[in-house]
Regions:
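Short extracytoplasmic/periplasmic juxtamembrane "stem" segments immediately C-terminal to an N-terminal membrane anchor
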Residues: 30-48
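Short, small/polar residue-rich loop motifs at catalytic or cofactor-binding pockets
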Residues: 42-46, 243-247, 427, 615, ...
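Conserved, well-ordered alpha-helix/loop/beta-strand core segments that scaffold catalytic motifs
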Residues: 203-247
């Protein structure tokens, strides 16, 4: 009887403990158990794309895939069959090595083996499809996704786009300036795992994505790829022809400050050498600076449209003598002839009419001595010398573009102020930013920083610079039917011991149309060998770029784009379903592309995956082959017609 009581009490104790554990402490123990086997894994996000204004993708994150295995889950009886499957899809696959590694890891009870093969999308999908057909092979084989930054046609854009560091962060150019916008937000997958030493996301059970991965935003630039290639090629040819130290150029919209093209030579051999010279390299501009001196004198009222300046060809300033470059600028010169023939003495005389403080003030007003604020990394600037140090000699030198250093972009923006109805605008490279669904989340707009010169002063200077092209030092820039304004510049380079004989910066600035300027360009060649005058060295590539611009855009002499453009139609389909189009491409299904623009097409079209494609025309998609819904693969020939 005693034993029965003991057994009965034992059962009561067990039941009481079970009740305590399961009912009273049940939730607590369940949570503890879940915590023991709960795992979270990061889902990588893609960095945003960088796209030109005409729709060419310059930078994007491409997907590659690693094969990873859990050797303990692979059935030894099926290993040969698995090796055969992988060999049929990976040409360089080493069957004996991989088989040996799997068996060795399995004996060691190792849960993770990454094969040394990087797969593209089609290879990965083919293997996945075959594994799905044979369930006996699928166990223990997984894929890990990697993102690699790809740059397309990088040579012409390298110094503008920049590059990333090993942590996928921008360290130069637009990649750095807009790093926060381009960087996505990684997601998190949570689930329960079976007990094992190594866990992958593929071994999780009851998974859920508790934080969705959000890809980075896409940047649409002001740059036009055709104009960028044109400018870049002209700089290359000039750089090589004159065996120069460097060459740089910028093409911009006058009224808006949009940069349409910006490039330089020589090109960097590696990331450490990347340098955006138009915003980093300082130079003395020489005679291209003279319109600023004349505009300042007119604005201050020390000269007017009727002013005539007398020159004997030389002038003494303190203990220095300033000479004209030749006899064409001696005698009595109107302001128009002074600019057209590029006289130095006349500029000194105009500067002497101004109070030093006033002259200095206008140097600041046109943006010299401070950065332009362009939206890219590494812009430099040299401060103006202190006002107290502005001697008569220094003021006289600056009047004709010597003794003052600036970047090419600073010089262009200052000259642009003179021709742009007196308005100093802020230059920019990014037009707008779009999110993953194609919604514009930020739109840059033209910014007028200051109204520096009156309309009358600007108009007079535009016509003075037109005379440079019609009868002065820049006559080679004439384009039949178009009113071009310009200014040549040849500046002797300064060194440690003063100005260096035989070393020059050769420049040419131009704009059109004269009455209401739309486009402006500045090209500068550093130390050309052979010829060195701006009219001989820098003018020809400027003219070539303008000729290409006029033809490409269909621009009439008034600066209006006359080529009939397809009117932009707001189509709910393209705004709502660009993401779906991208997904259908990803799933090897031809989407319905009708109605979307070339820019949108290029933003979602996977060029590397479907490389056999042809796009015809511009505007919006009108016809496509294959038809929507057709299965496609890497060998499919795709043709898109736009109007």
């Amino acid at each position: 009887m005693f034993i029965v009581i003991i057994i009965f009490l034992g059962f009561l104790w067990i039941i009481a403990n079970l009740f305590y554990i399961q009912i009273i402490k049940g939730d607590e123990w369940q949570k503890a158990g879940e915590m023991q086997y709960k795992s979270e894994f990061t889902v990588k996000s893609k960095r945003g794309k960088i796209i030109t204004n005409d729709g060419e993708v310059l930078a994007y994150d491409g997907e590659t895939y690693d094969i990873v295995m859990d050797p303990t889950l692979i059935d030894p009886e099926n290993i040969d069959k698995l090796m055969e499957l992988l060999k049929s899809n990976i040409s360089s696959f080493d069957v004996s090595k991989v088989k040996r590694d799997i068996l060795e890891k399995s004996r060691q009870n190792k849960k993770y083996l990454k094969l040394e093969y990087i797969l593209g999308y089609n290879e990965k999908k083919n293997i996945q499809d075959e594994l799905s057909k044979d369930k006996s092979l699928k166990s223990g084989v997984f894929f890990e996704t990697n993102y690699t930054r790809n740059y397309i046609k990088n040579s012409a854009f390298q110094e503008l786009i920049g590059y990333l560091d090993v942590d996928n962060k921008g360290v130069y150019g637009i990649e750095k300036t807009y790093n926060d916008q381009l960087t996505g937000v990684d997601g998190v997958i949570e689930g329960f795992r079976i007990p094992r030493k190594f866990t992958t996301v593929y071994s999780l059970k009851e998974t859920k994505e508790i934080v969705l991965a959000k890809n980075g935003n896409d940047l649409f630039l002001t740059l036009d790829s055709v104009l960028q290639y044109t400018l870049d090629d002209e700089l290359r040819k000039t750089f090589e022809q004159y065996d120069a130290v460097s060459a740089m150029g910028i093409l911009m919209e006058v009224e808006t400050g949009k940069i349409l093209a910006m490039s330089s030579y020589p090109k960097a051999k590696n990331n450490a050498e990347v340098k955006n010279r138009p915003i980093t390299d300082l130079f003395e501009p020489g005679s291209i600076f003279k319109p600023i001196t004349v505009a300042t004198g007119l604005q201050l009222g020390v000269i007017n449209r009727n002013t005539v300046v007398a020159s004997t060809g030389h002038i003494k300033v303190a203990d220095r003598v300033v000479n004209d470059h030749d006899g064409s600028t001696t005698g009595s010169l109107t302001l128009e002839n002074l600019i057209a023939k590029s006289g130095n003495v006349g500029m000194v005389k105009i500067a002497q009419m101004m109070k030093t403080r006033d002259f200095y003030s206008y140097l600041e007003k046109v943006g010299l001595g401070k950065k332009t604020g362009i939206d890219t990394y590494s812009e430099t600037s040299q401060k103006l010398l202190p006002l107290k140090d502005m001697t008569e000699v220094k003021k006289s030198n600056i009047a004709f573009g010597q003794g003052i250093a600036m970047t090419q972009l600073q010089m262009l923006m200052a000259l642009n102020t003179v021709i742009n109805h007196g308005k100093l605008v802020k230059p920019y490279l990014v037009d707008h930013i779009e999110d993953n669904d194609g919604n514009v989340i930020h739109q840059n707009a033209p910014i007028v920083l200051e109204k520096v010169f009156s309309e009358e002063v600007s108009k007079l200077n535009r016509h003075y610079m037109e005379a440079v092209v019609t009868k002065g030092t820049g006559q080679g820039a004439q384009i039949l039917g178009y009113n071009i304004g310009g200014k040549t510049g040849t500046a002797q380079k300064s060194g440690y011991k003063g100005y260096e004989k035989g070393k020059y910066f050769s420049s040419f600035f131009a704009f059109f149309p004269v009455e209401n300027p739309k486009y402006a360009i500045l090209i500068t060649i550093n130390e050309p060998h052979g010829a060195y005058y701006g009219a001989a060295v820098a003018l020809p590539p400027v003219k070539s770029v303008f000729e290409k611009l006029i033809k490409y855009k269909g621009i009439n002499p008034q600066g209006i784009i006359t080529e009939k453009k397809q009117q932009s139609v707001i189509n709910p389909y393209q705004k709502k379903d660009l993401k779906r189009i991208a997904e259908e491409f990803e799933n090897e299904l031809m989407p319905d592309l009708k109605g979307i623009s070339l820019r949108e097409l290029l933003a979602v079209y996977p060029q590397r995956k479907y490389s056999k494609y042809k796009f015809v025309g511009s505007g919006q998609v009108k016809e496509q082959w294959p038809l929507p819904g057709t299965r496609i693969n890497k060998d499919t020939e795709i043709k898109i017609v736009l109007e």
